[in-house]
């Protein structure tokens, strides 16, 4: 059964935050670009030496 929560807004708070939308969009674009860069780095490492990369995350002999 889904739960519904009532959102309480003050009289000062606008219903639509049109002013903050461009800023949020820019932040999202920056975040997406940064994430893409990290994923590209991981992909290039995996292409060159996947075994060593995965081995760095695996415990050996109870370490």
UniProtKB/Swiss-Prot annotation:
One of its GO terms (molecular function) is protein tag activity. It comes from the Bacteria. The keyword DNA-binding does not apply. Residues 19-57 are annotated as: ARC ATPase binding. Keywords: Isopeptide bond, Ubl conjugation pathway. Residues 1-28 are annotated as: Disordered. InterPro entries: Ubiquitin-like_Pup. GO terms for biological process: modification-dependent protein catabolic process; proteasomal protein catabolic process; protein pupylation. There is a cross-link at residue 63 (Isoglutamyl lysine isopeptide (Glu-Lys) (interchain with K-? in acceptor proteins)). Pathway: Protein degradation; proteasomal Pup-dependent pathway. Strongly interacts with the proteasome-associated ATPase ARC through a hydrophobic interface; the interacting region of Pup lies in its C-terminal half. There is one Pup binding site per ARC hexamer ring. The N-terminal unstructured half of Pup provides a signal required to initiate unfolding and degradation by the proteasome but is not needed for pupylation, while the C-terminal helical half of Pup interacts with ARC to target proteins to the proteasome. NCBIfam families: pupylate_cterm. Protein modifier that is covalently attached to lysine residues of substrate proteins, thereby targeting them for proteasomal degradation. The tagging system is termed pupylation. Belongs to the prokaryotic ubiquitin-like protein family. This is Prokaryotic ubiquitin-like protein Pup. The lineage of its organism: Bacteria, Bacillati, Actinomycetota, Actinomycetes, Bifidobacteriales. The gene is pup.
């Amino acid at each position: 059964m889904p739960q519904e929560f009532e959102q309480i807004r003050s009289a000062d708070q606008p219903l639509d935050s049109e002013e903050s939308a461009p800023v949020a969009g820019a932040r999202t674009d920056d975040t997406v670009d940064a994430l893409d860069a990290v994923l590209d780095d991981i992909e290039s490492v995996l292409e060159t030496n996947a075994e060593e990369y995965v081995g760095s995350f695996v415990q050996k002999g109870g370490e």
